[in-house]
Amino acid sequence: VRLRIIDGGASTSFWMTFGGGDPVLVSADGLDVVPVEKNKTFIGIAETYDFIVTIPEEGKIEFRITAQDGSGTASAFLGNGNMLPAPIVPRPDKIGMMQKMAKMDMKMGAHALKYRPKKDERYKMKEEYGMQMDKMQGMNMDNSEKKDDAMPKMDHTKMQGMEMKKDSTQHDKMQDMNMDGMNMAMPKDTMKMETMAGMKLQGMDLFSEYNYDYLKSPQKTNYDKDVPVKEILLNLTGNMNRYIWSMNGVPLSEADKIKINNREVTRIIFNNLTMMHHPMHLHGHFFRVINENGDYSPLKHTVNVPPMQQVTIEFYGNEGDEYGDWFFHCHILYHMMGGMARVVSYDTPRDPRMYGYPVSNLVAETNKYYTWGMVDVASHTTALNVISSNIRNQFNVSFEYGWNKNLEAEATYEYYLHDYLRVFGGVNIENETRKSLDQFKTTAVVGVRYLTPYLFALDARIDNELRPRIGLGRSIMLFPRFSVFGYYEYQIDLGIVNNLPVNKDFTSETVWSAGAEYFLSRNISLMGSYDNRFGGGGGLSVRF
């Protein structure tokens, strides 16, 4: 029987395994490939694979899918009788993966939200983050999009320090090298760019089983060498803290269309600078996924880009029906909605059928405001925090009231300059006299907030009475359901606006608190804390 498997999930990719003999993989994304016996196969979101499965006269074959993170499995059975079990894919060794990563020379933290989104820093970003190729001094990074179909030049003497696995240095293995983005002068007959997708450097095999080298097209898929090539580098970037996803540090809402035309080959290099897989899908097209099969690289409509890896695709819009705008996105739903998408636009009039569906509506879907909050109800204090935010803009409202009638409330607006830094302004209200609600002081505040290394939340501000204040807070998850937190705040009044007490050069105020929280469920926690304004106590925290 022919079994077609489609990953229709929103956020989960799977490993597929079969009981009995190895099935024959015959199609990928609906297009034929050279048949190959393959049992354990990875399927990304939106991908499709067809297998020829031979059902025995006696016994039933288990077809088993395992979530990529090992969190769950499901099975279907083909045939009757005793079960022929499918191989079990073990859970990933997360500790082992982290140990391997610790040995790699790579810099994490590429911005998902750049300070200057219109500035082209693609190649600088690629060079700075991810796997550090310090010894590849001959790499030539051109900040313009390349339209040259010839192989650029590279000084071979600069590759003396490159560390490779021993078998990859042999001359007869050179066809497996992946030099995407490197400029290398080699005779065209000796090495074609399309055949260099398989090179693995020392320490880069952490995700080596995620590749498409087993897929080979039955016919040649390469394009005429005289057709010009436009090369586009897309660094895949993301921020798990705020869940912003983008390309080249620019989410869809701040990006220009990718302009292409049907008179040239469009070559897109995906460079994944995140620790998540990204199944990239281009509407309305099949593209070549460059692998070790060179001219016979397969055609697909979705390609999975593993963490810290690079994948190259090509397409040539010369069929006559490629025109207008096409959506191009990560098929993990939450990544797409977080901004990891683009609009690919041919230099043709827009499809008249789309006039009632402006692109701006699509873009707005990826830049919605989301609102959430938390209420603390405890024996010594009551607090409320509400946040409403889209990609760049955020509104905050906070309120604290203690059993001893100490009250403070604040409303601010902040703007994210990049992932970790934002500027803000707002209004702060607090009672002037402790243990009395008769009089309140209202001040205007401006400042910056910064998420420091090691995830400390820094707040530096000054109010309209020219009193500077600095605050620093941190929450640490010690166990799956248990966290501790702390906050320190110091404000000083130098008497620039206010009159100081006699014989005082300044006055100051210190606020600090510390506590712990146990998560009963996703939305409710037990908490206990001590605050130098309110004292100690305990209660419930409710998230909404």
Q: Predicted regions: what is each one?
A:
Residues 446, 514, 533-544:
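Outer-membrane beta-barrel "beta-signal"
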Residues 1-18, 44-67, 219-238, 253-282, ...:
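Beta-strand cores of secreted/periplasmic/IMS beta-sandwich domains, seen most often
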Residues 382, 391-396, 419-425, 452-458, ...:
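Repeated loop/turn-to-beta-strand initiation elements of outer-membrane beta-barrel proteins
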Residues 375-379, 397-401, 425-429, 460-464, ...:
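Transmembrane beta-barrel strands of outer-membrane/channel proteins
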Residues 234, 363-382, 388-399, 494, ...:
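Transmembrane beta-strand segments of Gram-negative outer membrane beta-barrel proteins
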Residues 377, 388-390, 413-415, 448-450, ...:
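Residue-level signature of outer-membrane beta-barrel architecture
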Residues 1-124, 293-304:
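Histidine- and aromatic-rich segments of cupredoxin/plastocyanin-like copper-binding domains
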Residues 1, 6-7, 87-276, 286:
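Edge beta-strand plus adjacent loop/short-helix module at the start
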